[in-house]
């Protein structure tokens, strides 16, 4: 897809604590507090993995009311919930665009564009109305950050870098350089 670039990886977990512990066990570094997404009833933790790149650990926020729509990234899907009972997983990736409307003209699946905000961050994100990952996980989610602020710029640099990543048939593999060596998350 033209006009997009990698933005972040998505790790889903039943709880943020489980997700953070999983990332720590895989990469040897821990994500830091992110924030809440009231529209989706989720919250997250974030890990810097390079310039304008981050890894997001996301989970349903037990303190949030149920959203008036299905949550993103399949988090309401019974199959995803069963999968996460066995532990957190790298489930998706998000690509950034500077022109959401142009990117969506090339995008092979209809999505609803949500305008969201948290603190000084503002973004538009394309989410299928059913909350599932686009293309059953074979297409990236599209995001457009409004203004010049990007969450990765505020994250501590732990020395973890995404070296390469591949998505094929809904499966993701990411290779990282970390302070303790090269690590791969399948």
Which residues are covered by each model-predicted region?
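Active-site-proximal cofactor/substrate-binding loop regions of enzyme domains
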Residues: 1-57, 65
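Eukaryotic phosphotyrosine signaling hubs
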Residues: 6, 88-91
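Long, hydrophobic/aromatic-enriched structural stretches that serve as scaffold segments
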Residues: 60-61, 66-71
